[in-house]
UniProtKB/Swiss-Prot annotation:
Cellular localization per UniProt: Cell outer membrane
Keywords: Cell outer membrane, Lipoprotein, Membrane, Palmitate, Plasmid, Signal
Entry similarity comment: Belongs to the Multicopy lipoprotein (Mlp) family.
Signal peptide segment: 1-17
Protein name stated in the entry: Lipoprotein MlpB
One Pfam family this sequence matches: Mlp
Lineage top rank: taxon: Bacteria
Membrane topology of the entry: Lipid-anchor
GO cellular component, one term: cell outer membrane
Lipid attachment site numbers (S-diacylglycerol cysteine): 18
Protein's job: An outer membrane protein that may participate in pathogenesis. Some human Lyme disease patients have antibodies against this protein. The Mlp proteins probably undergo intragenic recombination, generating new alleles.
Organism (species): Borreliella burgdorferi (strain ATCC 35210 / DSM 4680 / CIP 102532 / B31)
First-listed, main subcellular location of the protein, grouped into a coarse class: membrane
Amino acid sequence: MKIINILFCLLLIVLNSCNANDNDTFNNNSVQQTKSRKKRDLSQKELLQQEKITLTSDEEKMFTSLVTAFKYTVEKLSGDTNGCNNENKNKCTGFFDWLSEDIQKQKELAGAFTKVYNFLKSKAQNEAFDTYIKGAIDCKKTLHKIVIIITNMEKVRTKRAYFRGVAGSIFTDNNDNDGIYKCLKDELLNDTSNHYEGLTSDWDN
């Protein structure tokens, strides 16, 4: 009888031990599932946030015009003695390819470009904006007002458009996309710069 009692006690100990292991396994699985669920929820939240960022029609229009203006400028100035060479052309292409994946940065640049865009659009009158700007870059229009550039602290009037001066600054002095982005945004927002003053001064209307 004593032997039976001993065996029964041993059986209870074994069962309790197994149950404890099962509980540990269950708890570990629960923790892992909770972590996985949180990670999945976070990823979905980030994805939803990215999906919410879109350009308005006006932002898209301004950003497209900005890209067109600078690509056209650098294309025209390839090989020029002012530093807008093939290296800058490659930087420009690479930069806007990089920017095409980041809607938030596109929104920020469109916003920064608003003041310049609206000013030039008011001068374009009935002419399409991109056509008007390309004409200025080609120096075929009467946009010689967009030509004041500061050299050795003196104002010099040349047949250089606003976009040429800015393009020279951002692509010549920066070697990475983040640097180009920051410089471009700062230039567009700076309404006290030589480029902006040259753009907006001495208009007849």
